[in-house]
Design a protein with these regions (language model features):
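Carbohydrate-binding surfaces in secreted/extracellular proteins
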Residues: 125, 183-221
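Secretory/extracellular carbohydrate-interaction modules
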Residues: 100-174
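N-terminal twin-arginine translocation
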Residues: 23-34, 43-59
């Protein structure tokens, strides 16, 4: 038989792949046997691994029967199965049909596994071919990936195949035989048994005619080790006809029915069932709780609504009901007047069809109390998850150990290559493309759902989330040909983009201004107040100008500048946009609004600077990368001036290079801090290896600290950076990822001291080892006030406030009519700094402006006081 087609895909960030990129995204499988022999057991299943749910054997009855319903049609087969890829399988007429071409399409059984000890095994399944092409079908045993974890097995695993072809062959691995004749119109029964012997296991495959039950052929393979058999079990199908067109997609090629298994080799893991409620995300802000439940593609016979219930007085009470969105497969709840003062257990309730009638699925979690009285609020920062180490057990376990109050996923929750089988980047069949992106997104929830169910989650989209290497949104513009995508705009259809945004962001607080952009593409930029931390959640890409056709011609990629003589002022052009006027107006309002907040943070996709100097697996030197928020420069400065008004730190990702930066606008260190968190699993590597050392280096921080001017002319101070190893490849994929500077970050907001601590944790770190386990240069602590570090020209008279503790203070330049800054002070006294001579209005209040003084001027003395009562 031909070798199995690989499921895994490129480890590199694929920004320039075209629409039909399946072949480019496939790669050779990891040698999992070699990996298992060389990996210490404690590396993967350690004290950190609790939330990964690597369970022991379940109940004593490990036999199974598929029992697919005859009266249900849908793409999702049921909670015990995972299909690769989702869009190439469907349930119809009581059988599973493969509706796409290609090699190694498969159905993974999630709740049954073959023991490492081996033993007798008996598997049966009916199957039939609906094409005369070179097709094959059968069962696969011992499916195992590099991490020896059932979800990793399901996505990246290889196993031993036993099956038959549409011609006259049957096979177990590389052992083949011929059928006496082809099965009849009713198909065949495949019967696989494993029998332990002194020399291993003997596998016997018999093919029977389904109608007559007459044996048509048999083949045996001897000497198979228990290690080879251990792992997942699956059905597989393959049709070698090339990529199926959108018009042909949906026509069945082959089918399976009545899959059964029994024997001592099987172990039950019913706790691994997945769906139909796959995972949820929620936020809690200003008394309103929003939650989105994610579903697989259900059918017309299944329920169309979902109930949200909370536990009160030992009973479940329904508080909201929501429709399942037809395209996004989500249900979003919005509950006002939420009880923020206590942990609230919740469950989602959904009715669906399986064999025997209706079933009810329950998904439970907790909406935690709002930690308003907690001195420290911890935010976990995550981005950029290639799938080679799915389900990212060390990141999930590390996050669980830190127990952050808020999760922040800043973009690239998946890549075009995630889950293998290429990418459906096309505009013709929106449903097929939506199923493709849904399977990639669901992997994110499968990895981190146990964390998200119990804590507020910020989730923002970046370029790869909408199938772009770089996305220049230009206010919702549409691009009708892929080769024009660098001109600006979205290639994927607006209804697809909106579905993806609904999947990832519909649980966020209501948008600041919900008016859609061009082509009716929705927006989600908003604010969230939780634990008395005020967050601004931005969309870096939606309004950004595309470089191709806008900037002067540039050799090579329009977003990569390689000319060392390049003058960055030549691309700082009028009309170029970054955040856009709407988000700038939002930031102006947000920085002035401190109701219910003690500290502020901006969360967005990427940094407002171009720091990495070397890119890609060969570490190619680049002067500038226009994908960063360092370009366009003037809008970049405008954004930072607004963020600075609220003393807000900036949290983001995208760069695949952990960095702690201090922005500069007119000079160095006159703008906020930025923490660019590591990628969860880095593919495309970047490094900061400047040719010259920075000015004024920080001697206590390793690797090129100091003041720099980036390739776009922006001023930036590098406080810490965790560069990858030049020779990053390792046999252990987790070690490779750590060598590429993968991991996660934390921001700790200390409301008592108004200090912020940035922590940067390598992928293979152990939080129990303390701060020394972090990347060199971290942790670092700085004051909230350091986010507006300008040198004042003077100070207004000292404020002495009565009637409020820790009041809000706002300073307004009367000549310019502009807010200089707003903050919530500590205590009742504050001497406001100002940065120009003149008259100022000072406003003071608790959760509203209750007092103001106009015409206040800088005072040279320290004894002058401005008494204010609120």
């Amino acid at each position: 038989m031909p070798d199995k087609m690989p499921r895994d895909s490129s480890h590199e960030d694929p920004p320039q792949l075209g629409p039909d990129s399946s072949s480019l995204l496939e790669k050779d499988q990891l040698d999992r046997r070699r990996f298992l022999k060389t990996t210490a057991a404690g590396l993967l299943v350690s004290s950190l691994a609790g939330p990964v749910r690597v369970m022991g054997a379940g109940g004593s009855d490990s036999s199974f029967q598929s029992r697919w319903p005859a009266d249900v049609e849908r793409y999702w087969l049921g909670p015990a199965y995972w299909t690769n890829p989702l869009q190439d399988w469907r349930l119809a007429d009581g059988r599973v049909e493969m509706i796409g071409n290609g090699g190694d399409r498969n159905v993974q059984h999630l709740t049954r596994q073959i023991r490492a000890e081996g033993g007798p095994l008996d598997l049966r399944v009916e199957t039939g071919f609906l094409t005369s092409a070179n097709a094959r079908a059968g069962v696969e045993v011992g499916v195992q990936g590099a991490l020896a974890e059932y979800r990793n097995n399901a996505i990246h695993g290889t196993g031993l195949k036993a099956g038959h072809t549409a011609g006259d062959r049957l096979f177990v691995g590389d052992t083949e035989a011929r059928l006496d004749r082809a099965p009849g119109a009713d198909g065949a029964v495949l019967h696989l048994t494993t029998t332990p012997t002194e020399d291993g296991h003997t596998l016997t495959l018999s093919v029977l005619d389904a109608a007559s039950e007459k044996e048509l052929g048999q083949v045996q393979k001897t000497g198979v080790s228990a290690e080879t058999l251990a792992g997942n079990l699956a059905l597989f199908g393959g049709v070698d006809e090339g990529e199926v067109s959108d018009r042909e997609w949906g026509t069945p090629k082959l089918w399976f029915r009545n899959w059964e298994g029994q024997g001592a080799a099987l172990e039950a893991h019913d706790e691994r069932a997945f769906g139909p409620i796959l995972f949820s995300q929620h936020t809690l802000s200003r008394g309103t709780m929003k939650m989105t439940a994610q579903f697989p593609p259900m059918g017309a016979a299944d329920g169309s609504t979902v109930r949200l219930q909370v536990r009160r007085d030992e009973a479940w009470t329904s508080v909201d009901e929501a429709e399942v969105h037809e395209r996004a497969r989500t249900a979003t709840f919005r509950v006002t007047d939420w009880d923020e003062g206590r942990d609230v257990p919740y469950r989602l309730v959904y009715d669906y069809r399986m064999a025997g009638g209706s079933r009810t699925d329950h998904y439970e979690g907790t909406v935690r109390r709002n930690p308003v009285d907690q001195d420290e609020v911890v935010v976990g920062g995550f981005s950029c998850a290639m799938d080679m180490a799915f389900p990212h057990p060390r990141v999930a376990a590390g996050a669980r150990a830190h127990d952050p109050d808020v999760l922040a996923f800043t973009g690239d929750q998946y890549y075009e290559s995630t889950g293998g089988y290429g990418v459906q980047r096309n505009q013709e069949n929106v449903e097929r493309a939506t199923l493709d992106v849904l399977r990639k997104w669901v992997l994110h929830g499968w990895a981190f759902g146990d964390l998200m169910r119990d804590r507020p989650t910020i989730c923002l989209l970046d370029d790869h989330d909408v199938y772009h290497g770089n996305i220049w949104g230009e206010g919702g513009k549409h691009v009708d040909r892929w080769e024009l995508h660098n001109n600006g705009g979205y290639f994927m259809p607006p209804e697809w983009v909106n579905a993806v945004q609904r999947m990832q962001t519909s649980h966020l607080p209501d948008p600041y201004d919900p008016t859609p952009v061009k082509n009716d593409i929705t927006v989600y930029y908003t604010d969230m107040v939780y634990g008395r931390i005020s967050f601004a959640l931005l969309e870096d890409r939606k309004w950004k100008t595309g470089p191709d056709g806008f900037l002067p011609p540039n050799p090579g990629r329009p977003d990569h500048i390689e000319d060392s003589d390049f003058d960055p002022s030549t691309i700082d052009l009028p009309k170029a946009k970054l955040l856009g006027e709407r988000q700038l107006a939002f930031l102006e309002d947000w920085t002035a609004d401190w109701r219910g907040a003690d500290m502020k943070a901006v969360v967005s996709q990427t940094s407002f600077a171009q720091v990495p100097t070397h890119h890609g697996g060969n570490f190619k030197y680049l002067v500038a990368d226009l994908d960063s928020n360092g370009w366009p420069q003037t809008p970049r400065d405008e954004a930072l001036r607004r963020i600075r008004k609220g003393f807000a730190v900036h949290l983001g990702g995208d760069q695949h290079l952990p960095m702690l930066l201090r922005y500069g606008i007119d000079g160095w260190n006159d703008a906020p801090y930025n923490f660019c968190v590591p990628g969860i699993a880095v593919g495309y590597v970047r490094a900061f290896w400047p040719e010259d050392g920075g000015d004024n280096p920080q001697t206590d921080v390793p690797e090129h600290p100091g003041r720099y001017t980036d390739g776009l002319g922006n001023k930036v101070t590098v406080r810490a950076v965790a560069n990858p190893k030049e020779d990053f490849a390792a046999e252990n994929p987790l070690r490779t990822l750590t060598n590429k500077s993968s991991g996660y970050g934390l921001l700790r907001f200390n409301k008592a001291t108004r200090e912020i601590t940035a922590e940067c944790w390598p992928l293979l770190s152990d939080p129990a080892q303390g701060a020394e386990a972090q990347y060199a240069g971290w942790p670092q602590t700085f004051s909230m006030l350091d986010n507006d570090p300008r040198e004042p020209v003077g100070h207004l008279p000292r404020l002495s406030v009565t009637g409020a503790t820790n009041p809000m203070v706002q300073v307004v330049d009367e000549e310019q009519g502009e807010i200089v800054y707003t903050l919530r002070i500590q205590g009742q006294e504050f001497r406001p700094p100002v940065y120009a001579d003149g008259a100022y209005t000072v406003r003071v209040g608790d959760d509203g402006w209750q007092a103001s003084r106009e015409g206040v001027r800088p005072s040279e003395g320290t004894g002058d006081a401005l008494e204010v009562s609120v």
